[in-house]
């Protein structure tokens, strides 16, 4: 592995809209109590396994920022440098933002639902500017004209990977342990790149909330262990299965 640092990926803890099974995207919702507990536990896992981050990267969304703060506090690393970028934001779900996943699936059918939710290159319909769940008036995104109106995973790859290559890789090359606290789809975009996954294979990848995923990288920034290693594999498997089942009607 040489002097290359270690990369730790962490999806935010369960959010209010995760719990309600709503498409969230760029809507800025908070964490549930379960999500806050997941964040604290993630920091404990980092400390227990002596995987203490030197620098943190996160998005501009509070569910990631709060998760990062709670995790760092739990690991006694609140003092490390923090860098935030909209490029780490969740995928923008367009006009689906705020809609119930099960109701959307029932209305449009399984095939269309899965294409919008998990395909690599099929974006949902555009969100209307000025509508309840759009971000065009949000001051966080004034320098990017309010941000996208919809995105597919390919769009997330296109906005995130240049930031990873131009900014984050420098810390890894310097031998630092880098913690990225982000979102299901921004992390899927990065994992696709790291593990060189095909457009077809990425469809089946689900990332659970609140469980650190460790990547040891070689000098070419390729994973020593393909797919990385979850610090709590059993909980990660259960969490990924729960993510995969989203869209099922409630009993």
From Swiss-Prot:
Positions contributing to substrate binding: 11-18, 24-25, 63, 90-93, 101, 117-118, 184-185
Presence of the UniProt keyword Isomerase in the record: yes
Catalysis: reaction(s): (2R)-2-phosphoglycerate = (2R)-3-phosphoglycerate
UniProtKB keywords: Gluconeogenesis, Glycolysis, Isomerase
A biological-process GO annotation: gluconeogenesis
PROSITE patterns xrefs: PG_MUTASE (PS00175)
Function: Catalyzes the interconversion of 2-phosphoglycerate and 3-phosphoglycerate.
Sequence similarity: Belongs to the phosphoglycerate mutase family. BPG-dependent PGAM subfamily.
Name of this chain's protein: 2,3-bisphosphoglycerate-dependent phosphoglycerate mutase
Gene giving rise to this polypeptide: gpmA
